[in-house]
Curated annotation (Swiss-Prot):
Coiled coil ranges: none
Species name: Buchnera aphidicola subsp. Acyrthosiphon pisum (strain APS)
Alphabetized GO MF terms: DNA-binding transcription factor activity; sequence-specific DNA binding
Segments passing through the bilayer: none
Name of the protein in question: DNA-binding protein Fis
The keyword Protein transport belongs to this UniProt entry's keyword annotation: no
Listed InterPro entries: Fis_DNA-bd, Homeodomain-like_sf, HTH_Fis, Trans_regulatory_Fis
Pfam family, one: HTH_8
Domain of life: Bacteria
Self-association state and partner proteins as the record states: Homodimer.
Gene3D superfamilies reported for this sequence: Homeodomain-like
UniProt keyword terms in alphabetical order: Activator, DNA-binding, Transcription, Transcription regulation
Amino acid sequence: MLEKKTNTEFLVLSTTNTQDKNIKQPLCELVKKSLKYYLSNLNGKDVNNLYELALSELEQPLLDMIMQYTRGNQTRAALMLGINRSTLRKKLKKYSMN
């Protein structure tokens, strides 16, 4: 679950560990862990699209959740995201979410 932590500028993700304890971590830390895991498992393979890969892993679920939250209202979603409505439409099309 994502939430905005009080008096901070980062998003927090609640996760559950093996002892069923709810752990809250900044989203940026989870991204770092995921990237570290990904990079450690490359086994010498070359990667040339990591930025696009990482961005799409965040952008697609973000757009999906915001569109659900706004019940498909693109104007409201664009305002929430701080982007132009035409940019939002372009991104929705990119992920076949239109």
